[in-house]
């Protein structure tokens, strides 16, 4: 592992754990509750000591210049709600070197397993990990088993989530974001499937934040490395308090 890569990984995942806040949702669909004033919400999560913020390149350019925050991860996959049958087809919209030049220290790519366009998304993630390798940037793989062609093996208690983590690992990602599997036993299988840090996604907002925190406790006990949660944080009345509470579980428990 290169010196640049290892130092950037340690910055984003101190002691191998992280509270990452993705705010890439506004490209897919807008209005998005909590993302109307990006300056305000980004200031809140920075002040609460989030370990990373995941955004698209345009937001990073503006916010890096404004804040000097050195832990942006550039999400390079995009689609919108207007794409019809291709609305879940994430296309690559930036390179690792461009992300670096805009102020990011890591990059993120998404694959939706089982989508009719899965092969193209796998190709794009492979290109991204190769680019990132050249410039010493860590890669977050957001891999979700959610498409209509998804095949789940009868003995897979994770519902394809372990395979999603394995896809990210084998394609060269350094961190993977996956959905919660519903219980600690199955999530432990996900974490055991790969030697890279596994971050739990938040999913659609719903329920209480206390319920979200309880899931995070289960995930950490099962071997998780932290969270990559967006709507539960930026859509809340007080994002600062949400990040602080997540840090207490991920870093201090």
Task: Show the residue positions of the predicted features.
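Alpha/beta enzyme core
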Residues: 15-67, 71-198, 206-229, 236, ...
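N-terminal basic/disordered segments at the start of proteins
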Residues: 1-13
